[in-house]
Every structure is written in C-alpha cells, then in structure tokens.
Amino acid sequence: QIQRDGFRAARRAGVKMVFASDAGVMPHAEVGRQFRIMTEYGMTPMDAIRAATRNAAEALGRESDVGTIAPGRYGDLIALAGDPTADVTLLANVPFVMKGGGIVKDAR
C-alpha cells in the first residue's frame, strides 16, 4: 500500500513516470509486469506505454532518436495479438519484434 500511495502522490505532483528494466531485482522475463502494475496504480494503459517509450527516452537524453516513431529515428517495432491500450497485459508477452529493420523474434 505504501508503494501504491507513493506512486499516486508522485503522479499527482506531476512527476514524469519512467518504465525501468535494469533494476536487477526481477528476472528479465518478468519486467513486462510493470505495465499491469502501473495501470493498477492509476495510470492509463497509454500512459504506461509512454513511460516505457517516450518518457524513458527523455530520461536518457535520447528523445531525438528513440522513444517515438518519426522520420529519422530508430524504428524498432513490436506486434501484438490485440490492442494494448485495451489490455496492457499483452505487453508482458510480445510475440513479434523487429529491430534495425530485421526480425529478431517471431513467436506467432
């Protein structure tokens, strides 16, 4: 409850949330659970997605080349079986990934 209250208080105060993956406290395959947790704590699915993309790029000072889809930026993409803005848990098990123009995962 303390973590949830702190998360909500930070959001109310205008703190920009960023999805993190390098804490080293959970197995890599479990990192996608953060999307579900963020929405349980009050974020919309799209806000949670932005935390993992645009906000993370801004936090790293890389917003000019990653974090959003735009001409001249790196275009790594994923494909899902449904709409993650309707079911954010889809992002915990991504079946298809393209990186640098090539397919790096295809579990469809």
Language-model regions, residue ranges each:
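His/Asp/Glu-enriched, well-ordered alpha-helical/loop segment
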Residues: 1-83
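Small/polar (Gly/Ser/Thr/Ala-rich) solvent-exposed segments
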Residues: 86
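Short aromatic-centered micro-motifs
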Residues: 97
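Extracellular/periplasmic ectodomains of large secreted or surface enzymes and adhesion receptors
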Residues: 107-108
